[in-house]
A protein has these predicted regions:
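Acidic-enriched and Gly/Ser
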Residues: 1-202
Length: 202
């Protein structure tokens, strides 16, 4: 079973990541289907597209766009699946909706996506805990590598370009290569900002 242009994937776990384990208790974090931040982004690849060359293989773990597994309310107020739904627990995902795939225990980006971790705000008078639009590149891609922008570099990115993901207990911002505006180089005195709630959740 293969799609011509899309991946066929199944979610790892539930469609929504609404709970977090606190000791022996499952804490419910969200009860609304509208909140995209709690949609599960992790999937297993069931099949790869026939007409698109991709490094992703059947069985790989991938990170997806938040709308693949999401549910919506239609005009009549009824819950419906996203247009990505195929059947049972299977979904279509276009190449543009697959951001990362895991290979040899490491995450590799697909196409022009990259992931940046925000840095701590050291200004004692500031109310924000992280510096706006500045972060450390954690997962790069081939486009950025050609520009000599590599993981570990401190970068400035466009305001509003960041989409929040939780990858391996780290809160990262997903964006495109052209959202990276400036490379500062590696800065040893800059500390990553990863809130405690990001650990142990997706």
């Amino acid at each position: 079973m293969k799609s011509v242009y899309d991946f066929i994937v199944r979610p790892i776990g539930e469609r929504y990541a609404n709970t977090k384990k606190i000791g022996d208790t499952d804490l419910v974090l969200n009860t609304k289907i509208e909140n995209w931040k709690f949609v599960n982004r992790f999937a297993e690849v069931v099949s790869t597209p026939l007409a698109v060359a991709t490094p992703v293989r059947t069985g790989d773990i991938v990170v997806l766009h938040q709308n693949v597994f999401r549910r919506f309310y239609n005009m009549k107020g009824k819950q419906v699946n996203s247009r990505s739904y195929f059947k049972d627990d299977l979904y279509f995902a276009s190449v543009e909706q697959v951001y990362l795939y895991k290979r040899n225990k490491y995450w590799e980006s697909l196409n022009d996506r990259c992931f940046v971790m925000p840095i701590k705000n050291t200004d004692t008078l500031a109310t924000q805990k992280e510096v706006s639009n500045v972060g450390i590149l954690k997962i790069g891609n081939s486009f950025l590598k050609e520009l000599e922008i590599t993981p570990g570099d401190l970068v400035t990115f466009k305001a509003g370009s960041e989409w929040e993901f939780n990858i391996d207990d780290e809160r990262l911002y997903c964006m495109k290569s052209n959202d990276i505006l400036l490379k500062h180089g590696y800065k040893e005195n800059q500390a990553e900002y990863n809130p405690r709630w990001a650990k142990g959740s997706r």
